UniProtKB/Swiss-Prot annotation:
Entry annotation: catalytic residues: D142
MF annotations from Gene Ontology: acetate kinase activity; ATP binding; magnesium ion binding
Record-listed Mg(2+) binding positions: N7, E379
The UniProt record lists the keyword Zinc-finger: no
Catalyzed reaction equations: acetate + ATP = acetyl phosphate + ADP
Keywords, ordered alphabetically: ATP-binding, Cytoplasm, Kinase, Magnesium, Metal-binding, Nucleotide-binding, Transferase
Reported function: Catalyzes the formation of acetyl phosphate from acetate and ATP. Can also catalyze the reverse reaction.
Residues holding ATP: K14, H202, L203, G204, N205, G206, D277, M278, R279, G325, I326, G327, E328, N329
Subcellular location(s) per record: Cytoplasm
Species this chain originates from: Deinococcus radiodurans (strain ATCC 13939 / DSM 20539 / JCM 16871 / CCUG 27074 / LMG 4051 / NBRC 15346 / NCIMB 9279 / VKM B-1422 / R1)
Name of the featured protein: Acetate kinase
Positions that bind substrate: R85
Gene of this entry: ackA
Top-level EC class as recorded in UniProt: transferase
Length: 398
């Protein structure tokens, strides 16, 4: 069975054609700057890369290029299902679902919770339904994995009406990634996932930590929105909620201006005054750049503090997992974080951490305590697998 996985952003469309059983990727790519004259698509297959301009620059045009490439590869008829990443499923969706008109309406109802993401996800689904009208489409939600959190973990200490009437609670994100690396960790450790307590850290431009007990999320660092939690590339992470009122009075900023700054001008970028790119910050820190050193130090401190806190949710920690662009590639972030986590019994294997090739999988801790793992995430494969489960369970021919 071949599954086409689509991730529709506000101005982009990421796609991959995968075999969920073997993990083979036959085609992948990214359409960027959709809605502008500069729209283009990058395709990769059989080790070859190609870039093309997109006339019209729409989601339909991008999917048209995907269809043409599938025809060229002789794979269009092999596609049996389409899996869609959907950022926010609210409280309604705790698992992937077959896309129906009712499901689309429910996703629309979640737009206030994810105004930047869900509208684009909906547009992508509807365009794909036009392009593949006879195939089953499955929605896989970033938030679904965290629906197993207990109420003490997901409720905010705010008026009950805010929760019951407006859905104000912690939802969490990056669920597909956290679920994938937890499963891979169980494979690497050769232990059944239901027996493991893991702390997973998805570290990229967006970053979050998750406490995974027996394969179920029991706490996570992101909340109502992806702004809560860790310091991120350009997002602030946790700040005092009173900051909005203070800046409105002292600086005359509007609510939307403050929110935009917390999302786009803060985090590593705001602290360093330089960049949101961890690679560049590490280089600058080595030359003595004060802002870069502050940003790097604060990122690691807050990450270690959050990971240590997740031990409370688990009670026992069997392992920690680093994933995402920073987690997979930054020896500095991994090493300095693990040094701070000695309180959990973790002991860094400095040689293993230094020797691990960038983007590779491996163990970077010494024996005698919880295991520290580096595992590249593969959200597209996880979406393909979950799509296959839903489609197979509905009796579609695979």
């Amino acid at each position: 069975m071949w599954t086409l996985v689509l991730n529709s952003g506000s101005s982009s469309l990421k796609f991959a054609l995968l075999n969920p059983a073997s993990g083979e990727v036959r085609l992948s790519g990214l359409a960027e700057r959709l809605g502008t004259p500069a729209a283009a698509v990058k395709l990769e297959h059989s080790g070859q890369q190609e870039s093309r301009s997109l006339e019209g620059g729409s989601y339909d045009a991008a999917l048209g290029e995907v269809l043409r490439e599938l025809e060229t590869l002789g794979m269009r008829s092999a596609v049996r299902a389409v899996g869609h990443r959907v950022v926010h499923g609210g409280e309604r969706f705790s698992a992937p679902v077959l896309v129906t008109p009712e499901v689309l309406e429910a996703v629309r109802a979640c737009v206030p919770l994810a105004p930047l993401h869900n509208p684009a996800n909906i547009v992508g689904i509807e365009a794909a339904q036009q392009a593949f009208p006879k195939l089953p489409h499955v929605a896989v939600f970033d938030t679904a994995f965290h629906q197993t959190m207990p109420e003490v973990a997901y409720r905010y200490a705010v008026p009950e009406a805010w929760y019951s009437q407006h859905g104000v609670r912690r939802y969490g994100f990056h669920g597909t990634s956290h679920a994938y690396v937890a499963g891979r960790a169980a494979e690497m450790l050769q232990r059944p996932l239901p027996t493991l307590n893991l702390i997973t850290a998805h570290l990229g431009n967006g970053a979050s930590v998750c406490a995974v007990a027996g394969g179920r999320s029991v706490d996570t660092s992101m909340g109502l929105t992806p702004l809560e939690g860790l310091i991120m590339g350009s997002r602030s992470g946790d700040v005092d909620p009173g900051l909005h009122d203070y800046l409105a009075r002292q600086a005359g900023l509007s609510l939307s201006e403050i929110t935009a700054a917390l999302n786009k001008e803060s985090g590593l970028l705001g602290l360093s005054g330089l960049t949101n790119d961890m690679r560049e910050l590490e280089k600058a820190a080595l030359t003595g750049h004060r802002g870069a050193r502050l940003a790097l130090g604060a990122f690691i401190y807050r990450l270690a503090k959050c990971m240590a806190g997740m031990a409370v949710a688990l009670g026992r920690v069997d392992g920690v997992v680093f994933t995402g662009g920073i987690g997979e590639n930054s020896r500095t972030v991994r090493g300095e974080t693990l040094r701070r986590l000695g309180v959990l019994g973790l002991h860094l294997d400095e040689e293993a951490n230094k020797a691990l090739p960038r983007g590779d999988v491996g163990v970077i801790s010494l024996p005698g305590g919880p295991v520290a793992l580096v595992i590249p995430t593969h959200e597209e494969l996880m979406i393909a697998r979950e799509t296959a489960v839903i489609v197979g369970g509905r009796g579609y021919a695979l």
